[in-house]
UniProtKB/Swiss-Prot annotation:
HAMAP family xref list: UPF0161_YidD (MF_00386)
Protein name per UniProt: Putative membrane protein insertion efficiency factor
Keywords: Cell inner membrane, Cell membrane, Membrane
Homology family: Belongs to the UPF0161 family.
Keyword Cell membrane: yes
Topology within the bilayer: Peripheral membrane protein
Main localization (coarse): membrane
Protein purpose: Could be involved in insertion of integral membrane proteins into the membrane.
Localization per Swiss-Prot or TrEMBL: Cell inner membrane
Gene Ontology cellular-component annotations: plasma membrane
InterPro entries documented for this protein: Membr_insert_effic_factor_YidD
């Protein structure tokens, strides 16, 4: 089965191309192209943890999106969560930049 032209496994919606977001998404993409192949497809979520981190950084910036991606990876594993877990489109005001621990139990 062939994939459509221009297909990307990562989120392709509009996002501001700030230096932090570009750098963060570049690191995630580098991981996807290199280490992900050696580790194998073992993510228990949809979208996968790296796709989630890419979208979170693209939508919410390097600081909030990076924390969201880190917490998602920490949830993924034996005894962790599983299933469909999309990135929220908008972060609520209680998710302030100076309180990243509030992103731990983030629900869309």
């Amino acid at each position: 089965m062939a994939l459509p032209a221009g297909y990307s496994r990562n989120w392709s919606g509009p996002w501001p191309k700030t230096p932090g977001r570009v750098l963060g998404t570049a690191f995630v993409r580098l991981y996807q192209l290199t280490l992900s192949g050696f580790i194998g497809n073992s993510c228990r979520h949809f979208p996968t943890c790296s796709e989630y981190a890419y979208e979170a950084i693209a939508r919410h910036g390097l600081w909030a999106g990076g924390w969201m991606g880190l917490f998602r990876v920490m949830h993924c594993g034996p005894g962790g969560t599983h299933g469909i877990d999309p990135v929220p489109e908008i972060l609520q005001p209680r998710h302030a930049w100076w309180a990243p621990w509030r992103l731990w139990k983030l629900k869309p």
